[in-house]
Swiss-Prot record:
This is NADH-quinone oxidoreductase subunit 1. NAD(+) binds at residues 66-69, 97. [4Fe-4S] cluster binds at residues 353, 356, 359, 400. The gene is nqo1. The lineage of its organism: Bacteria, Thermotogati, Deinococcota, Deinococci, Thermales. One of its GO terms (molecular function) is NAD binding. It comes from Thermus thermophilus (strain ATCC 27634 / DSM 579 / HB8). Its cofactor is FMN; [4Fe-4S] cluster. It catalyses: a quinone + NADH + 5 H(+)(in) = a quinol + NAD(+) + 4 H(+)(out). Belongs to the complex I 51 kDa subunit family. NDH-1 shuttles electrons from NADH, via FMN and iron-sulfur (Fe-S) centers, to quinones in the respiratory chain. The immediate electron acceptor for the enzyme in this species is menaquinone. Couples the redox reaction to proton translocation (for every two electrons transferred, four hydrogen ions are translocated across the cytoplasmic membrane), and thus conserves the redox energy in a proton gradient required for the synthesis of ATP. The Nqo1 subunit contains the NADH-binding site and the primary electron acceptor FMN. NDH-1 is composed of 15 different subunits, Nqo1 to Nqo15. The complex has a L-shaped structure, with the hydrophobic arm (subunits Nqo7, Nqo8 and Nqo10 to Nqo14) embedded in the membrane and the hydrophilic peripheral arm (subunits Nqo1 to Nqo6, Nqo9 and Nqo15) protruding into the bacterial cytoplasm. The hydrophilic domain contains all the redox centers. Its EC number is 7.1.1.-.
Length: 438
């Protein structure tokens, strides 16, 4: 059963996170204040308790926008109360998933929205220090964040006794160095501590023992920014949009051969058809597959049934895929699916930290080698079967989901496009070249 899925063309919805993206000077404090900036944080800190903020976010149905989709309010509630320890809030801005680029524009164009969201989140989880871990390649984003933090601190919006209350909160920017693995929350914390960015074994979970062994919450950029309109307009406003299990607005990204690739802020549950044809202007050439939520999500065939599927957590799970970050990638017919998956496998193999044997040997070793055989015309049918049999031996057997991220798209491609693998193996021919984006 689903709730009301508001159309992206429906006058009842309006953009909140991207309302000022692309506007001149939108990254400055003066611009943000002219448009009501920090008024929500000021009111909430004076009128609501931390527990009331958590309950409001729970009622809104906000789920993590970084890929996992865990309920945000529930995650916050895991933080201990009155334990006398330092609490930390971390914003994961290490946006490195191929096909994902939504957070970059929040960081670059509306950094004060993120800062206000982190003030609200920090208040809710009783954290007094926050860190924003920015992808190393996002230099402009990091520069603007640092400038925004400096502006906010100078006006008293960060630091001691915010808005005349007894709540203190400050922020710091940490620039990454280009490692995809740092997007995993425990590897990110190790990196912040100055250690090698290897993932940690869980439990203990970050809420019990996180950054420097202290209670910590890690949220995505879009997640934290969404807290501001929720606390401004209320949980009911947010929950009226979307589906039964996927509430509110979502930043959908679309890339590949479409007329208008980009980021579109639309209600959860918008269909692929609406995103691709009504917003992105339609494909530029024949399409064979859709990757629904960034490169780690299983691809789906480009069929009428799939096009009419709502882009929500529950609907895509029912289709054997995932919403992920909402980064839709279109694969044209002229591109070999084997080549596309081979390329992704090489990416994940390169980004593996090498800590866990299933990832180090399974992905960077066996998967890469099997793809090399099949893709260069030296494979046999048994290599395709071996690849298929290998995947469950890797999935779910490592400290972090990087190995799973390598397995899932290949698993989906074998489910829907296995004939392409078998054709290459039987005919002893390499993947068609050039298999490149125009």
């Amino acid at each position: 059963m689903t709730g009301p899925i508001l159309s992206g063309l429906d006058p009842r919805f309006e953009r909140t996170l991207y309302a000022h993206v692309g506007k001149e000077g939108s990254w400055t404090l003066d611009y943000y204040l002219r448009h009501g900036g920090y008024e929500t944080a000021k009111r909430v800190l004076k009128e609501k308790t931390p527990d009331e903020v958590i309950e409001e976010v729970k009622r809104s149905g906000l789920r993590g926008r970084g890929g996992a989709g865990f309920p945000t309010g529930l995650k916050w509630s895991f933080m201990p109360k009155d334990d006398g320890k330092q609490h930390y809030l971390i914003c994961n801005a290490d946006e490195s998933e191929p096909g994902s680029f939504k957070d970059r524009y929040i960081l670059e164009d509306v950094p004060h929205l993120l800062i206000e969201g982190m003030i609200l989140a920090g208040y809710a989880i009783r954290a007094t220090v926050g860190y924003i871990y920015v992808r190393g390649e996002y230099r402009r984003a990091a520069d603007r964040l640092e400038q925004a933090i400096k502006e906010a601190r100078a006006r008293g919006y960060l630091g001691k006794n915010l808005f005349g209350t007894d709540f203190s909160f400050d922020l710091h920017v940490h620039r990454g160095a280009g490692a995809y693995i740092c997007g995993e929350e425990t590897a990110l914390m190790n990196s912040l501590e100055g250690l090698r960015a290897n993932p940690r074994l869980k439990p203990p979970f970050p809420a019990q023992s996180g950054l420097w062994g202290k209670p910590t919450t890690i949220n995505n950029v879009e997640t934290l920014a969404s807290v501001v309109p929720i606390m401004e307009r209320g949980a009911d406003w947010f929950a009226q949009m979307g589906t039964e299990q996927s509430k509110g607005m979502k930043l959908y990204q679309i890339s590949g051969p479409v007329k208008r690739p980009g980021v579109y802020e639309l209600p959860m549950g918008t269909t692929f058809r609406e995103l691709i044809y009504e917003w992105a202007g339609g494909p530029l050439e024949p399409i064979q597959a859709i990757i629904p939520g960034g490169s780690s999500t299983p691809p789906l065939p480009f069929t009428e049934e799939v096009l009419d599927t709502p882009m929500s957590y529950e609907h895509l799970q029912a289709k054997g895929s995932m919403l992920g970050t909402g980064g839709v990638i279109l694969i044209p017919e002229r591109v070999s699916m084997v080549d596309a998956m081979w390329n992704l496998t090489r990416f994940y193999a390169h980004e593996s930290c090498g800590k866990c044997t299933p990832c180090r040997e399974g992905v960077a070793g066996f998967m890469v080698n099997l793809f090399a055989k099949i893709g260069t015309g030296q494979g046999e049918e048994k290599d395709v079967e071996n690849l298929e049999a290998l995947l469950p031996l890797i999935e779910g057997r490592s400290f972090c989901p990087l190995a799973d991220a390598a397995v899932w798209p290949v698993k989906g491609s074998l489910r829907h496009f296995k004939d392409q693998y078998l054709a290459l193996a039987r005919e002893k021919r390499p993947v068609p070249r050039p298999s490149l984006w125009r």
